């Protein structure tokens, strides 16, 4: 297993697919990383040399990934909630944020139906 940014990359997949197992690295970012390091995207991870892996590790550290990205997303949501803006209130109440109707749908966001107490 190749280890990049604290994540085990599957060795039997192409490098572009393997890089996507890192939180915060998608298709476009993975292709950009491969282009910057001059590695063919269809190369399997097990075929990479140690120098290529080191180059990949140094290139990946330029992006905000894994724990830092998760922390930023959480802090952004917390900031909205503390601010008391519309989106923050919707987050606090566990309702949809982007204008979807909630009379009939939004069960995923609202959770299971609650029985009416008499």
Curated annotation (Swiss-Prot):
GO molecular function term, any single one: structural constituent of ribosome
Record region (Disordered): 91-118
Biological process annotations from GO: translation
GO cellular component, one term: small ribosomal subunit
Family matches, as Pfam families: Ribosomal_S13 (PF00416)
Entries under PROSITE patterns matching the protein: RIBOSOMAL_S13_1, RIBOSOMAL_S13_2
InterPro entries listed in its UniProt record: Rbsml_uS13_C, Ribosomal_uS13, Ribosomal_uS13-like_H2TH, Ribosomal_uS13_bac-type, Ribosomal_uS13_CS
SUPFAM superfamilies in UniProt: S13-like H2TH domain (SSF46946)
Keyword match RNA-binding: yes
UniProt keyword terms in alphabetical order: Ribonucleoprotein, Ribosomal protein, RNA-binding, rRNA-binding, tRNA-binding
Subunit comment: Part of the 30S ribosomal subunit. Forms a loose heterodimer with protein S19. Forms two bridges to the 50S subunit in the 70S ribosome.
Biological role: Located at the top of the head of the 30S subunit, it contacts several helices of the 16S rRNA. In the 70S ribosome it contacts the 23S rRNA (bridge B1a) and protein L5 of the 50S subunit (bridge B1b), connecting the 2 subunits; these bridges are implicated in subunit movement. Contacts the tRNAs in the A and P-sites.
Family: Belongs to the universal ribosomal protein uS13 family.
The protein's name: Small ribosomal subunit protein uS13
Source organism of the structure: Hydrogenovibrio crunogenus (strain DSM 25203 / XCL-2) (Thiomicrospira crunogena)
